[in-house]
A protein has these predicted regions:
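Active-site catalytic microenvironments for nucleophilic, acid-base chemistry
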Residues: 25-28, 48, 64, 86-93
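Short, surface-exposed recognition loops or helix-turn segments adjacent to catalytic cores
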Residues: 36-40, 72-80, 100-104
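Short, polar/flexible loop-turn hinges at active-site or ligand-entry regions and domain interfaces
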Residues: 29-35, 67-73, 95
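Short amphipathic alpha-helical face segments that pack within enzyme cores
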Residues: 21, 81-85
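Conserved DEDDh/DEDDy metal-dependent 3′-5′ exonuclease domain
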Residues: 1-49
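Acidic two-metal-ion nuclease catalytic site recognized across multiple nuclease folds
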Residues: 84-145
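Active-site-proximal helix-loop-helix substrate-binding element of RNase H-like nuclease domains
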Residues: 43-81
Length: 145
């Protein structure tokens, strides 16, 4: 798995739980940690993005957003698929909410990793700080508008 996922960012619902298992298994296999393996956590992101959700359990968030029913909860495949749907929803919601700041940028893993560590009240600034240099590198006139 370490070689298969090399260079890939990882996403999990309640990533602190999964991260521990992941790093333990890498160690047991004698594999080095990949610096790209910074986990984005959909629980941390949901706490910042969806304050109106009843809670941040995966099933609750799936119902809250009317995501497809992927089957029995707490089964690896169903939870992974539900998390993927939730991540796509989060990316779409962020793109819509911060369209002016992000312009043509996609919601990248690096931005998600920053947002999950940002206070709810500082999301706007975090996105602006992230997007500014990205936009300037692509098109100087976009960064100044």
């Amino acid at each position: 798995m370490a070689e298969f996922t090399r260079g890939c960012p990882l996403v999990a619902h309640n990533a602190s739980f999964d991260r521990g298992f992941w790093f333990h298994e890498l160690e047991q296999a004698g594999c080095e940690r990949d610096s790209a393996h910074e986990f984005a956590c959909t629980v941390l992101l949901a706490r910042r993005l969806y304050p109106d959700a009843p809670n941040c359990k995966l099933g609750t968030l799936a119902q809250f957003h009317a995501l497809p029913d992927m089957g029995r909860a707490h089964r690896a495949l169903a939870d992974a698929q539900t998390t993927a749907h939730l991540l796509l929803r989060m990316q779409a919601d962020l793109a819509q909410r911060f369209a002016r700041e992000l312009g043509p940028l996609r919601i990248e893993h690096a931005l998600l990793a920053r947002l999950q560590r940002t206070a709810k009240t500082a999301l706007q600034r975090c996105v602006s700080d992230y997007a500014g240099p990205q936009l300037a590198a692509r098109s100087p006139e976009l960064a100044t508008n």
